[in-house]
Structures are given as structure tokens and as C-alpha cells.
Amino acid sequence: EPFVDIAENEKEIKITAELPGIDKKDIKINATENSIEISAEVKKEEKEEKKGYIRRERSYSKFYRSMSLPTTVDPSKATSKYDKGILEITLPKTKVEKKTSIKVE
């Protein structure tokens, strides 16, 4: 299971996940206003041929991570990048409307 860090500032939530050896085309991210899901499915096949024998090895791995977010975000404005095994997701917070007092009559 990948290591995941969640950081928060005034404007956004940043999620960093370590996904070494995974191709970015195998990563899927789904987000709602208060949660995020990161998953990947990796299938590899290695074939080695030498005189007199053939060796084939297959490997399959997958992971799924679902996390609640500490505050409400706008998933439609989320961005992500993947570089050297590190996935970074930025989720802008939704603007909280100012409270208005309502006079009871």
C-alpha cells in the first residue's frame, strides 16, 4: 500500500502518494467534495529466451486507497501530476459563504 501524505493550507488540500514503478496510465483518481480514491492496477509479463529454454514470468498487483478529506473541496478544479514515482494531487477548497444573521419577526 502506498504512503500518502495530506497537507492543508488556506486555499487547498495537497495529497502526495508514493507509487514507485507504476505507469501513470495505470493510475485512477476519483474525488468528491469530501473524499478521494486513488487506485492502480499493474500487470507485467517478462519473457526471457535462451538456448534450450524459455522463461516467462507474470506479475499482477493492485491497490486501492480511499480517504476522507478534512474540509470540502471542488473536485472539478482538481489537478494532478506524476513524476518519478510521486503522485501529487491538488484540490482547491470551496469558498465558505459568510454567515448572515436573520432577524426573527
What does each model-identified segment do?
Residues 1-105:
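Alpha-crystallin/small heat shock protein
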